[in-house]
Curated annotation (Swiss-Prot):
Domain of life where this protein originates: Bacteria
Lineage: Bacteria, Pseudomonadati, Spirochaetota, Spirochaetia, Spirochaetales
Spans annotated as Disordered: 1-24
Organism: Treponema pallidum (strain Nichols)
Protein name: Uncharacterized protein TP_0656
Amino acid sequence: MRTGTRCDLGELSHPRKTLPPRGMGILCNYTGN
């Protein structure tokens, strides 16, 4: 599951914690999935 703020579609494709979406300073956290 993704936790935190909304992430970019490209970021959602990664099952692990990835870098913030391009053009944004938001961090996407992934746990379990």
